[in-house]
């Protein structure tokens, strides 16, 4: 039987529980070692215990007291941005080389979008998975920017309010800041902006994302082909990821420029509009929670690629 590397998950909420189920069902080089929470009555800890996973409700300090801690190579942090900074610092005092997959917007490590720059950070000790909205939309900004220079990229992520637990709600400000920055650093836009909408509709609506870019004029066919190719790449690990409709284009001529606050008062170029839908795999919450699925799938894919390199060394 092939050797697998053990992982702990900090945060027994929606994201952590969904990720745990993915690892238990689909882990190739990664296996569950421990589930860590702070609420002894949490559903995530109860599920983990039923599935035979070591648990603690005493937070990251409780993790270090578990027998399995000595065998942990990976830690997925699904808490909050502020908590992640402390968790990383604390664990490194005991295991300096531990690999941290940051599922919060803390971003103390490099941003990682698997289909865009995942191969660039396989040796990093801490990688940041940006946000659910970033994982869905930044590949599309990158798809445009590999064809034409993108001056501005704006994304709107709409997720079901029911899929947003207390950790997500506590991170709203960090969500917009981290996603906006990653649109620039990873997506290639000169200026990025991110907006998140928690939709309270009942029954809950599926995750929807809209991406707008303003770029230099370029072949619309080339951009559309690049977008479709990128969507297929994301579908390799998030099967429910899809383009909702054909890519739309508007030519903004220099004779009729537009004003983009923070970018320029007289902007012209090619406006590209991309409409996405992300259906979840329903490993934990129902299929409307595509935001969980894309975040946990990206985190697991990144860890699997890191583990492949570590096991081959």
From Swiss-Prot:
InterPro entries with a match to the protein in the record? Acetaldehyde_dehydrogenase, Acetylaldehyde_DH_C, NAD(P)-bd_dom_sf, Semialdehyde_DH_NAD-bd
Question: Which family, according to UniProt?
Answer: Belongs to the acetaldehyde dehydrogenase family.
Which amino acid positions bind NAD(+), per UniProt?
A: 12-15, 163-171, 291
Which is a GO BP term held by this UniProt record? catabolic process
Give a yes or no for keyword Manganese in this entry.
no
> Which keywords does this Swiss-Prot/TrEMBL entry list?
Aromatic hydrocarbons catabolism, NAD, Oxidoreductase, Plasmid
Q: Does the keyword Plastid apply?
A: no
**What is this protein's name?**
Acetaldehyde dehydrogenase
- Cited CDD domains: ALDH_C
**Which gene produces this protein?**
bphG
Which HAMAP family does the record cross-reference, listed alphabetically? Ac_ald_DH_ac
From what superkingdom does this record's organism come? Bacteria
Identify the SUPFAM superfamilies for this entry: Glyceraldehyde-3-phosphate dehydrogenase-like, C-terminal domain, NAD(P)-binding Rossmann-fold domains
Enzyme class label: oxidoreductase
EC assignment: 1.2.1.10
Q: Which reaction does it catalyse?
A: acetaldehyde + NAD(+) + CoA = acetyl-CoA + NADH + H(+)
Q: Which GO terms describe its molecular function?
A: acetaldehyde dehydrogenase (acetylating) activity; NAD binding
List the active-site residues.
132 (acyl-thioester intermediate)
This chain's source organism reads: Burkholderia cepacia
